[in-house]
C-alpha cells in the first residue's frame, strides 16, 4: 500500500527533482496533484520548476559537496534526476547509506549520464543492435576511427550533452576538424571525449516511452506507450506526433529492445528509449531514465501523460498507457535574445482547432531556445501536426 502524507507537515512525502526545466516542471505539477511535497533544484534561479514547487533551491549539481549537503539537509524520500550533469557518485553513496532513494536507481543514473555508459551496456553487455561506434579523446583518434572503421557519413556527439548540442554529421574528411571543435563546444561539462557513430540508413526514428511500475500483484511490470515519431533539426526535436505507424514485427522488436535495456537499468519510472527503424529492423540509439522532450505530445494524446506516468510509477501507483487520441507537438522558439520576454498571439494560437499551449517560463530567451510547445489532437496525426505547427507559428515572443 502506498501512503502519501500532507505537504508541509511532519509526515509529508517529499520528492526532490535535480534539474527543473520544462520537463521537470511538469513532473512537479503531476507530483503535487498527488499530494507530494516538492523540492525543485537547478543551477540557476527562477528555473521553470522553481516557479511551481513548494521549495526552490539553487546549487551546482555537479559539485559533490553541494549536492550531498542539500540532500542531507532536505532528507527527501525520493531524489529524481532530470538532467545528466549531476555528481552521480554522491547519489550512489547516499543511496547505499540509506539516506534517500534515487529514481530509477543511482546505478541507472550513472550509466545514462553520458553516452558511453549506456552504449556499452546496450551493445556490449546486452547485445542489442546499435550503429557501429568508437569513443575518442582527440581529433587524431577521431580521424583514425573514421578511417579505420566507421567511414563516411558519420555522426559525432559529445559523450555528455543534451538537446542536440555539439552534434553534427560528417560527410567527408574536410569536415572532421570542425565537427570535433563543435562537439567540444557543445558538451555539458568540461570534457574532451566524444562518440563517433556510423550513419544508420533508417526510415524513421521513434521514442518508445517505457514505464516500469508496480502492478496489482505488487510486482514491477513493463508497459509501453504508443510509439512517438519526431523530426529533428541539428539533433534537437522540433515536432513530435503519436502514434507513429510501424509494422507489427518492428514494434515487437522495439519493445523487446526497450524492455531489455530498461529491465537491466531497473527501478521504477518512465524511460524515453530512442530507436532507429528501417522496415522490420530496429537499432537502439539512446535512453533517458526520465520523461522525454518528444513525449510532451502525450499531454494531449494519452489519458495519463508521460509526467503523470512518471509520478505514479515512482510512487508505486498503478499506471495506464492508453492512447486517448492522435496528436502532435510543435516547438515554440524564443525568437529573440532577451530576458523576460512577452508572448503575443496567444489568443490567435488557441483559435486553431483542438490546440493547447505550454509556456515554460524560462527567464532568458534565445533565438533558438525552446520556450514553449504547441499541442494539438485530432482524428488523424497529419491534421494534428498541421494544427500544432500553425498554433506554434502564431506565437510571437518579443523583448520588452
From Swiss-Prot:
Q: Which GO terms describe its cellular component?
A: cytosol
Q: Which InterPro entries does the record associate with it? A: ATP-grasp (IPR011761), ATP-grasp_carboxylate-amine (IPR003135), ATP_grasp_subdomain_1 (IPR013815), PreATP-grasp_dom_sf (IPR016185), PurT (IPR005862), PurT/PurK_preATP-grasp (IPR054350), PurT_C (IPR048740), Rudment_hybrid_motif (IPR011054)
UniProt EC number: 6.3.1.21
What reaction(s) does this enzyme catalyze?
N(1)-(5-phospho-beta-D-ribosyl)glycinamide + formate + ATP = N(2)-formyl-N(1)-(5-phospho-beta-D-ribosyl)glycinamide + ADP + phosphate + H(+)
The role this protein plays is:
Involved in the de novo purine biosynthesis. Catalyzes the transfer of formate to 5-phospho-ribosyl-glycinamide (GAR), producing 5-phospho-ribosyl-N-formylglycinamide (FGAR). Formate is provided by PurU via hydrolysis of 10-formyl-tetrahydrofolate.
Family designation: Belongs to the PurK/PurT family.
Q: What is this protein called?
A: Formate-dependent phosphoribosylglycinamide formyltransferase
Amino acid at each position: 500500500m502506498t501512503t502519501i502524507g500532507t505537504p508541509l507537515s511532519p509526515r509529508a512525502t517529499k520528492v526532490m527533482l535535480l534539474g527543473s526545466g520544462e520537463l521537470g516542471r511538469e513532473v512537479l505539477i503531476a507530483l503535487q496533484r498527488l499530494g507530494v511535497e516538492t523540492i525543485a533544484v537547478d543551477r540557476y534561479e527562477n528555473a521553470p520548476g522553481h516557479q511551481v514547487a513548494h521549495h526552490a533551491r539553487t546549487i551546482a549539481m555537479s559539485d559533490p559537496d553541494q549536492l550531498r549537503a542539500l540532500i542531507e539537509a532536505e532528507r527527501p524520500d525520493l531524489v529524481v534526476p532530470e538532467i545528466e550533469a549531476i555528481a552521480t557518485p554522491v547519489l550512489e553513496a547516499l543511496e547505499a547509506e540509506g539516506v534517500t532513494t534515487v529514481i530509477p536507481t543511482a546505478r541507472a543514473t550513472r550509466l545514462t549520464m553520458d553516452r558511453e555508459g549506456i552504449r556499452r551496456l546496450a551493445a556490449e553487455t546486452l547485445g542489442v543492435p546499435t550503429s557501429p561506434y568508437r569513443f575518442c579523446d582527440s581529433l587524431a583518434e577521431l580521424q583514425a576511427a573514421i578511417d579505420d572503421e566507421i567511414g563516411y557519413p558519420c555522426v559525432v556527439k559529445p559523450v555528455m550533452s543534451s538537446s542536440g548540442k555539439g552534434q553534427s554529421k560528417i560527410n567527408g574528411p574536410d569536415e572532421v576538424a570542425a565537427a570535433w571543435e563543435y562537439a567540444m563546444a557543445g558538451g555539458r561539462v568540461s570534457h574532451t571525449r566524444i562518440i563517433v557513430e556510423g550513419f544508420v540508413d533508417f526510415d524513421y526514428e521513434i521514442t518508445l516511452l517505457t514505464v516500469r511500475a508496480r502492478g496489482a500483484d505488487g510486482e514491477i511490470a513493463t508497459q509501453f506507450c504508443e510509439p512517438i515519431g519526431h523530426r529533428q533539426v541539428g539533433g534537437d526535436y522540433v515536432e513530435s506526433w503519436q502514434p507513429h505507424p510501424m509494422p507489427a514485427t518492428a514494434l515487437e522488436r522495439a519493445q523487446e529492445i526497450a524492455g531489455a535495456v530498461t529491465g537491466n537499468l531497473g527501478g521504477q519510472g518512465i524511460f524515453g528509449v530512442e530507436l532507429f527503424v528501417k522496415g522490420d529492423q530496429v537499432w537502439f540509439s539512446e535512453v533517458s531514465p526520465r520523461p522525454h522532450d518528444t513525449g510532451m505530445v502525450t499531454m494531449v494524446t494519452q489519458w495519463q501523460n508521460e509526467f503523470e506516468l512518471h509520478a505514479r510509477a515512482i510512487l508505486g501507483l498503478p499506471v495506464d498507457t492508453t492512447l486517448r487520441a492522435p496528436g502532435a507537438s510543435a516547438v515554440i522558439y524564443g525568437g529573440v535574445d532577451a530576458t523576460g520576454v512577452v508572448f503575443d498571439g496567444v489568443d490567435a494560437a488557441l483559435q486553431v482547432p483542438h490546440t493547447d499551449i505550454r509556456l515554460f517560463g524560462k527567464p532568458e530567451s534565445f533565438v533558438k531556445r525552446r520556450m514553449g510547445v504547441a499541442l494539438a489532437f485530432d482524428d488523424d496525426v497529419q491534421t494534428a501536426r498541421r494544427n500544432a505547427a500553425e498554433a506554434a507559428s502564431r506565437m510571437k515572443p518579443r523583448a520588452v
